[in-house]
């Protein structure tokens, strides 16, 4: 059953047991990258909470965090990695199956 496979996949990747982290990865799957400010607005978390979630995703290899110089100074940008991309692809395939 696909539901069992999906639950197992999420349990095996405990970092995704928190809905906001799964949501961040799903968003990055479609956008490929996002500025920290964009993620703040989308998640409605405070800066500290969001940064902690991103650190966990980064430590797990699902996202890459880069500080990029801009006219306004260095800004944090988050990119989905190949590992994150593959995981979300598996999640979406399981959701599509009937």
Identify the role of each PLM range.
Residues 1-9, 16, 26-30, 79-98:
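Amphipathic alpha-helical dimerization/coiled-coil segments
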Residues 54, 70-73, 86-89:
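Short, structured secondary-structure boundary patches
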Residues 54-60:
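Basic amphipathic alpha-helical segments that dock to polyanions
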Residues 7-49, 77:
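N-terminal helix-turn-helix DNA-binding core of bacterial DNA-binding proteins
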Residues 60-73:
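Beta-hairpin "wing" of winged helix-turn-helix
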């Amino acid at each position: 059953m696909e539901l069992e496979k999906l639950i197992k996949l999420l349990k095996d990747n405990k970092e995704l047991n928190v809905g906001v982290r799964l949501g961040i990865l799903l968003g990055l799957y479609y956008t490929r990258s996002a500025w920290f400010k964009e993620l703040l607005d989308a998640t409605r978390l405070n800066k500290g909470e969001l940064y902690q979630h991103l650190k966990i995703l980064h430590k797990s290899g699902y996202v890459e965090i880069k500080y990029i110089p801009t006219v306004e100074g260095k800004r944090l940008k988050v990119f989905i990695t190949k590992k994150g991309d593959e995981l979300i692809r598996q999640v979406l395939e399981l959701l599509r199956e009937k």
